[in-house]
From Swiss-Prot:
Family: Belongs to the ATG17 family.
GO molecular function, one term: protein kinase activator activity
Reported function: Autophagy-specific protein that functions in response to autophagy-inducing signals as a scaffold to recruit other ATG proteins to organize pre-autophagosomal structure (PAS) formation. Modulates the timing and magnitude of the autophagy response, such as the size of the sequestering vesicles. Plays particularly a role in pexophagy and nucleophagy.
Locations listed in the record: Cytoplasm; Preautophagosomal structure membrane
GO cellular component, one term: Atg1/ULK1 kinase complex
Region (Disordered): 1-23, 469-492
Protein name per Swiss-Prot or TrEMBL: Autophagy-related protein 17
Protein species of origin: Sclerotinia sclerotiorum (strain ATCC 18683 / 1980 / Ss-1)
Alphabetical UniProt keywords: Autophagy, Cytoplasm, Membrane
Amino acid sequence: MASPTNAPGSQSQTSVSSANHPDPIIHGREILETLVSHLLASKRSLSSISTVWRANEIVTSAKTALEESVILNARTGFLQSGINEQMKVLMKVRNSIECVYNDGQKDFKNVLHTLDAANARLESTMDVLRSTMVDAAFRPAGEEPRSLLDFVDEQGVEGMRDGLKELIRESKETQKEFDTSLLSFDDDLRSLRSGFKNTKVSPPSYSPIPSHLATLEGHAQEMAALLSSLSSHFDLCLNAIRHTEGGYAAVRNAASNPPPGAEPVSVSGVMNTSHDDINEEPLTEHEREEMLFVLEKDAAEVEDVVMELRDRQNEMEIKHDAILDHVSHLTEQFKQTTSIYKILEGVYERLPGYIIAGQDFRARWEDTKAQICGQMDDLEGMRLFYENYLSSYDGLILEVRRRKVAEEKAKTIAKKAMEQISKIYDADMKERHDFKHDVGDYLPVDLYPGINAAAPRWEFRLMEDEEAVNSSPSLERELVEVSSKRDGEAQG
C-alpha cells in the first residue's frame, strides 16, 4: 500500500460491483475475528485524515508565503535599487567635495612653500645686514660697533611674520573644520555601504519556495490518494463484516473491549444493530474468496500507508519550516533595507551641510590666500628695501672714496697753485724792490701812494659754511674693494 495503485481497497469497488448473485452469509469464528481486527485497524487508520488536513494547511500557507516572498523581494529590490543609485550620486558629490579638499591642500602647500622661500630670501638679506658692520670711520669716535641692521626697525618684519602665522593658523582651523565635515560624510557613506552589503536581495531564481511548493503539492496529492485508499479499504472491511453472520455484534463487542494498550475505536454511526437483521445480497464463493484475498493483502499494507502519511507530513513540515524561514529572512531583509533607507534620508538631510562646508572652505581659503599673498608681497618689498639699503651702503662707501679722491685731487691742485703763487709773489716782490731802487729817488711819494705797497699775498683754504663738514674719512682699501665688487654684482 505504498502508492495509490497498490492502496487497500483499490480493487474493492470492482469486487463489490461484480456481485450479481445471492450468497449465504460467511461463517467461521476465525474469519470473523480476523475481519473484526482488520476493520478496527482500518478505522484507526482513518484518523490519519488529520495529516491530510495539515497537508492542505501547509500547501495553503506555502502559497501565501510565495505571494508574500514575491512582494517582499519586489519591495526590497526596489528600495535597494534606489539606494544603490542614490549612493552613486552621493559618491559623486563626495568625490567633488574631496576635489575641493585636495585642491585646497595642494594650494595651501604651494603657498607655504612660496612663503617659506620668500621668508628665506628676506632672512638671508637680513643676515647680510646683520653681518655687515658699519665702518668706524662713519661713526663717532668711541661708539660701539653697529651693523647695518641696527639702523633699521625690525618690528615691521616681525609684525608681518606674526600676521602670516595668524593667517596660517586660521587656515588650519578652517581645514580642520572641513576635515571633520568630510570625515562625518565618510562615516555616513561607510554605514550605508556596510548595511547595503549585508542586505543584498537574493534573485528570485534563488528562492527555494517554488520548488518546495511543488514538492508540498505533490505530497498533498499523494497523501489524499493514500487516504482514499485507506477509506476504500475500510469500505471493503465493512462490506466483509456485512456478509459475515454476527459481524456487527462482534465489531461492537471488540470496540467496547479493546485489548490492553490498544487505541480505542469508536464505531458509532458505522455499526447499526438493525444491520444484523438486514439480508445482505449473497456473494458467490468466488466473490467471497476474491474479496477476502484483496482484504488480506490490503490489510498488510495499512500500517505502511499510515507511516507513509506521517513521513510525508513530517517532510512537508520541514519544507514548510524552510519556507517560513525564507520568508522571515526576506522580511528581515526588508526591515534592514528600510532602516538603510532611513539612514539614507538622514544623509540627505545632512548633505547640504557637507556641500556648504566645502563651499565655505573654498571661499575662506581664497580670502586667506589673498591675504597671505599680500603679506608675501610686503615681505618681498621689505627684502627689496633691505637689498637697496645694503646696495646704498656699498654706494656710500664708494661715494666716500670718490669724495676722498676728489679732495686729494683738490689738495694737490691747491698745493701746486700755492707753489706757483708763492713763486710769483717772490718774483713780484723782487721786481718791486728793484723798481723802487731804480726810480725811488726821482718819483715823489705822493704821486702814487701805493708805490711802496707790498705785493698782495694769495692763499687757498677750505670754505666753512652751514653745509660744510670735515674732510671725508679714509677707508681701508679692502672695504672699498668688497663694496665695489658687491655693487658690480648688483648692477650686473
